[in-house]
């Protein structure tokens, strides 16, 4: 009998937006499935690369979808190769940027890298860690300064010779900047080549990336071919929209959920995700089966929020957060109607958070309000207020919301 055509397992294809090599997607699926089967037959785990440039200090759920896929490969017995771009971070990825990025110092990059590894679970049990740091052979953490910092000028010139200016200008970000007359520094053309060379250095079988990284991932495949290495597959995942359900999740847009947020803040934010984004959140951030979830969007939100919070903090903490949100600050159910009211009639807007707390009588003074906010004791609708100077434009923005101090003081704000 002829052998059956191999197909990708569900854990791998879930949420996948694109797969290299280019051409018929079915062929790419079958080729990767065949490589998986061959690796299993040979007892050789695939080497799955994910590169991150530590240009900031915090990871949010939008970033986490790539790490979740990398963890899925680990759990299937393959080797995750996490590349910390400590060298490339000093150049800065030009993807999505309309101007040259500010270059970071070695010290800044090292500090950010340490923070990233902690957030990914370096010191956590693997049950709640994003990556498995515990199981031998499942994770390699590499720094691309290992092979890039020692490159001499002939090697750099040789690397530059593998690409063309036409290729670089075909990259959407460069094309837009060139067309608008915005300067493009020559070192920025190096970035895709250096990131691509990472795949050569670590002998990657698969590289993960967001759909905005298609050019860079393809460059890695091209360079592997140039250096006579086995060519990698490029597996691309979608860009997660933020809490507004419209724009991509981004700290600068204020629509993020951070990995280190406490359970109540995380749950409270997630259960307010727009209806149009719920299915993507379920698919990309959980292992839940959409077909088994309630059709009611509100119930689906709750199930998603519980699952995501549990994946970071454990089910017990997630269930407590769900109960706290429902009974104290969720705005639904009998308990919510028992929260005492606080009038905004005498509040002068725009109002800063510290002033608001004292104006509605939750804190005795502005100085106490500042202290409580800085201590992490203040929440609005379950979401922690961290900045005493956070500003609210009008009473309409706060109408009906619950302001919380500590574990026992709650006030529903009324205009």
Swiss-Prot record:
Residues 351-415 form the S4 RNA-binding domain. It is found in: Cytoplasm. One of its GO terms (biological process) is tyrosyl-tRNA aminoacylation. A motif ('HIGH' region) lies at residues 54-63. This is Tyrosine--tRNA ligase. Its EC number is 6.1.1.1. ATP binds at residue 251. A motif ('KMSKS' region) lies at residues 248-252. It comes from Parasynechococcus marenigrum (strain WH8102). Belongs to the class-I aminoacyl-tRNA synthetase family. TyrS type 2 subfamily. InterPro entries: aa-tRNA-synth_Ic, Rossmann-like_a/b/a_fold, S4_RNA-bd_sf, SYY-like_C, Tyr-tRNA-ligase, Tyr-tRNA-ligase_bac-type, Tyr-tRNA-ligase_bac_2. GO terms for molecular function: ATP binding; RNA binding; tyrosine-tRNA ligase activity. It comes from the Bacteria. Homodimer. It catalyses: tRNA(Tyr) + L-tyrosine + ATP = L-tyrosyl-tRNA(Tyr) + AMP + diphosphate + H(+). Signal peptide: none annotated. Pfam families: SYY_C-terminal, tRNA-synt_1b. Keywords: Aminoacyl-tRNA synthetase, ATP-binding, Cytoplasm, Ligase, Nucleotide-binding, Protein biosynthesis, RNA-binding. Catalyzes the attachment of tyrosine to tRNA(Tyr) in a two-step reaction: tyrosine is first activated by ATP to form Tyr-AMP and then transferred to the acceptor end of tRNA(Tyr). It is an enzyme of class 6 (ligase). GO terms for cellular component: cytosol.
């Amino acid at each position: 009998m002829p052998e059956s055509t191999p197909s990708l397992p569900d854990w791998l294809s879930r949420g996948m937006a694109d797969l290299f090599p280019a051409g018929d997607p079915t062929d790419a699926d079958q080729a990767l499935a065949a490589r998986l089967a061959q690796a299993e037959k040979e007892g050789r785990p695939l080497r799955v690369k994910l590169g991150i440039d530590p240009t900031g200090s915090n990871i949010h759920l939008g970033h986490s979808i790539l790490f979740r896929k990398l963890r899925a490969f680990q759990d299937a017995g393959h080797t995750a190769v996490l590349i910390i771009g400590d060298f490339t971070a000093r150049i800065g990825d030009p993807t999505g940027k309309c101007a040259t990025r500010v270059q970071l110092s070695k010290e800044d990059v090292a500090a950010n890298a340490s923070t990233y590894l902690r957030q990914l679970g370096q010191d956590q049990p693997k049950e709640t860690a994003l990556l498995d740091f515990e199981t031998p052979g499942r994770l390699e953490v590499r720094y691309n300064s290992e092979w890039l910092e020692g490159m001499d000028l002939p090697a750099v010139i040789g690397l530059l010779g593998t690409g063309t200016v036409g290729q670089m200008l075909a990259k959407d970000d460069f094309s837009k900047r060139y067309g608008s007359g915005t300067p493009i520094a020559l070192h920025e053309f190096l970035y895709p080549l250096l990131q691509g060379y990472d795949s050569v250095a670590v002998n990657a079988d698969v590289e993960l990336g967001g759909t905005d990284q298609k050019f860079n991932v393809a460059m890695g495949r091209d360079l592997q071919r140039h250096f006579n290495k086995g060519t990698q597959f490029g597996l691309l995942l979608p860009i997660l929209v933020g809490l507004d359900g419209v724009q991509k999740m981004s700290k600068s847009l204020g629509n993020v959920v951070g990995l280190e947020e406490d359970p109540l803040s995380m749950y409270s934010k997630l259960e307010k995700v727009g209806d149009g984004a719920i299915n993507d959140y379920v698919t990309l951030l959980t292992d839940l089966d959409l077909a088994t979830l309630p059709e009611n969007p509100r119930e689906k939100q709750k199930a998603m929020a519980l699952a995501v919070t549990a994946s970071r903090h454990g089910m017990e903490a997630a269930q407590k957060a769900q109960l706290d949100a429902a009974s104290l600050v969720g705005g639904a159910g009998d308990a919510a109607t028992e929260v005492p009211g606080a009038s905004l009639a005498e509040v002068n807007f725009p109002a800063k958070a510290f002033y608001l707390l004292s104006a509605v009588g939750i804190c005795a003074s502005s100085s106490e309000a500042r202290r409580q906010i800085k201590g992490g004791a203040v929440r609005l609708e379950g979401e922690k207020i961290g900045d005493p100077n956070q500003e609210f434009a009008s009473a309409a923005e706060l109408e009906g919301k619950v302001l919380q101090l500590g574990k026992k003081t709650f006030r529903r704000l009324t205009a």
